[in-house]
UniProtKB/Swiss-Prot annotation:
Disulfide bonds: none
Name of the featured protein: LOB domain-containing protein 18
GO cellular component, one term: nucleus
Family per record: Belongs to the LOB domain-containing protein family.
Amino acid sequence: MSGGGNTITAVGGGGGGCGGGGSSGGGGSSGGGGGGPCGACKFLRRKCVPGCIFAPYFDSEQGSAYFAAVHKVFGASNVSKLLLHIPVHRRSDAVVTICYEAQARIRDPIYGCVAHIFALQQQVVNLQAEVSYLQAHLASLELPQPQTRPQPMPQPQPLFFTPPPPLAITDLPASVSPLPSTYDLASIFDQTTSSSAWATQQRRFIDPRHQYGVSSSSSSVAVGLGGENSHDLQALAHELLHRQGSPPPAATDHSPSRTMSR
């Protein structure tokens, strides 16, 4: 195709071939495998060579209508040059936007696609104003805040009894006062001996009648003489001590003592 005096050749063609016979590239077959020319070549009424730059994006059925708007607004030669400077993986996006801009320019020769941009911006402004109005309306409809409940009085904490700390070795007195050097330990043993002897004598006095063979009749007679039990008991004690070989203690009573016959 001749566009502006330059022949358009591109790499990576396909999708459509040149109609009417064999082609120099492809061994006598058509450039697109016998499917007919691409939409761009069909609109331009030219032979679609293998590697046509428009073939991947404009098919032979509906591509002619889209390419007509592109050619009218931008020109086929300018679009082919633009696509050659774009990476292959981004050319599809470029073709879509070019077609959109071309159709918008045909519908609105003054603003083109900018008219659509202005309409979207105005829509955003209207939506923001509506959101602000709704927020203010909701703020006026909010229920009053409930009254804060009085804080409960803090309950008195129970008093816990703190046990005294355990005694340690350090709590003991540093020194213990020793016994006086003049203290006579023999007196302790003498007192212990005398107390044990006294306890032994008391045990002997528990039942003197059985120990010394005194009959119950004679003892009862002796105790009952004169009707004075205290003097009889005292006399009996003197008699028993005399039999054991101990001198009887001095009598404290000046009344005459009664003795028992052996």
